[in-house]
UniProtKB/Swiss-Prot annotation:
<dbReference type="Pfam" id="PF00049">
    <property type="entry name" value="Insulin"/>
</dbReference>
<keyword id="KW-0119">Carbohydrate metabolism</keyword>
<comment type="function">
    <text>This venom insulin, from a fish-hunting cone snail, facilitates prey capture by rapidly inducing hypoglycemic shock. It is one of the smallest known insulin found in nature and lacks the C-terminal segment of the B chain that, in human insulin, mediates engagement of the insulin receptor (INSR) and assembly of the hormone's hexameric storage form. Despite lacking this segment, it both binds and activates human insulin receptor (long isoform (HIR-B)) with a moderate potency (EC(50)=30.45 nM).</text>
</comment>
<feature type="modified residue" description="4-carboxyglutamate">
    <location>
        <position position="44"/>
    </location>
</feature>
<dbReference type="InterPro" id="IPR016179">
    <property type="entry name" value="Insulin-like"/>
</dbReference>
<feature type="propeptide">
    <location>
        <begin position="25"/>
        <end position="28"/>
    </location>
</feature>
<comment type="subunit">
    <text>Heterodimer of A and B chains; disulfide-linked.</text>
</comment>
<feature type="modified residue" description="Glutamine amide">
    <location>
        <position position="107"/>
    </location>
</feature>
<keyword id="KW-0800">Toxin</keyword>
<keyword id="KW-0301">Gamma-carboxyglutamic acid</keyword>
<feature type="propeptide" description="C peptide">
    <location>
        <begin position="57"/>
        <end position="83"/>
    </location>
</feature>
<dbReference type="InterPro" id="IPR036438">
    <property type="entry name" value="Insulin-like_sf"/>
</dbReference>
<protein>
    <recommendedName>
        <fullName>Con-Ins K1</fullName>
    </recommendedName>
</protein>
<keyword id="KW-0165">Cleavage on pair of basic residues</keyword>
<dbReference type="GO" id="GO:0005576">
    <property type="term" value="C:extracellular region"/>
</dbReference>
<feature type="modified residue" description="4-carboxyglutamate">
    <location>
        <position position="87"/>
    </location>
</feature>
<dbReference type="GO" id="GO:0006006">
    <property type="term" value="P:glucose metabolic process"/>
</dbReference>
């Protein structure tokens, strides 16, 4: 094995380790339910938030309304404890429970 292929193998191993630790296993809450932490940005964040706020109900036009708000930057100005949804769930990973805290702002 040459030095360059050994270096490549070590670099790949480190990359896999970093990815696994960044996106590792879901956390468990005190109640025993699994908390999936994820990072969502842009239209993916808007779409997921719309689906989460509606639950299983399908209301026509709601996701497109959210996308229109996102284009005007209103959806990203939502504040919770002095922080916005982008800081909470795009720059950092967050749970569905944290995302649900923004539902009342969008629907109200």
């Amino acid at each position: 094995m040459t030095t360059s292929s050994y270096f490549l193998l070590v670099a790949l191993g480190l990359l896999l380790y970093v990815c696994q630790s960044s996106f590792g296993s879901p956390h468990t809450s005190d109640s025993g339910t699994t908390l999936v932490r994820r990072r969502l940005c842009g239209s993916e964040l808007v779409t997921y938030l719309g689906e989460l706020c509606l639950g299983n109900r399908k209301r026509r036009g709601f996701p497109s309304m959210l996308k229109a708000r996102a284009k005007r930057n209103e959806a990203f100005l939502l504040q919770r404890d002095g922080r916005g949804i982008v800081e909470d769930c795009c720059y950092n990973d967050c749970t569905d429970e944290k995302l649900k805290e923004y539902c009342h702002t969008l629907q109200g």
